[in-house]
């Protein structure tokens, strides 16, 4: 799998291209390698040519791939306080990547779970499955950041992460199980 950067903007307001690179790297760490199998490329571009998407999963003459659009992510976070933008961008970018990988897993790798084409609400089901996949992976990303040496190891960083989760309208659920006591697991609000 290749990672292709096709950006013309500098994205200074969001910390620059390095922040986008770090956001993608963080998200890839918590994705199982088998879920990326047969994916030709992940492309990071400035804008969706149609002007409506944050990212897309595609299966065309170029193979199977994911395109993430940096411009909409950055614009949606400009009004947030600077101290939480780092986490907000990483969460937003990660969620979009996870959602698109969820489409890949559902439509391409695990065809048994894909709904039949004649089902009444096929697209809604596929979108719901991709959202559920993204929510699970986002929880793993947050847990990864909270480990010793992680991005949200300090109390100030955890507070910024909590504020970013709230700013992105993710309700937080603190699980009290033995293996994940104190871990924040985002649950998408309805």
Predicted regions and their residues:
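Active-site scaffold of zinc-dependent metalloenzymes
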Residues: 47-91, 107
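Long, charged, glycine-rich C-terminal linkers/tails
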Residues: 40-47
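Zn2+-dependent metallopeptidase catalytic core
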Residues: 19-38
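Short, flexible/disordered intra-domain loops and linkers
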Residues: 13-14, 77-87, 115-121
């Amino acid at each position: 799998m290749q990672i292709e950067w096709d950006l013309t903007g500098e994205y200074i307001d969001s910390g620059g291209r390095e922040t986008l690179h770090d956001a993608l790297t963080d998200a890839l760490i918590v994705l199982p390698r088998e879920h990326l199998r047969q994916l030709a490329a992940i492309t990071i571009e400035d804008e969706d040519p149609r002007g409506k998407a944050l990212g897309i999963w595609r299966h065309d003459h170029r193979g199977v791939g994911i395109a993430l659009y940096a411009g909409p992510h950055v614009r949606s976070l400009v009004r947030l306080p600077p101290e939480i933008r780092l986490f907000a961008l990483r969460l937003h970018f990660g969620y979009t990547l996870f959602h698109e990988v969820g489409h890949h897993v559902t439509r391409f790798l695990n065809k048994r779970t894909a709904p039949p084409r004649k089902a009444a609400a096929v697209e809604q089901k596929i979108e719901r499955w991709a959202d559920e996949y993204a929510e699970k992976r986002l929880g793993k990303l947050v847990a990864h950041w909270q480990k010793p040496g992680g991005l949200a190891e300090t109390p100030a960083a955890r507070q910024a992460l909590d504020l970013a989760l709230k700013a992105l309208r993710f309700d937080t659920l603190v699980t009290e199980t033995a293996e994940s006591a104190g871990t924040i697991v985002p649950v998408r609000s309805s």
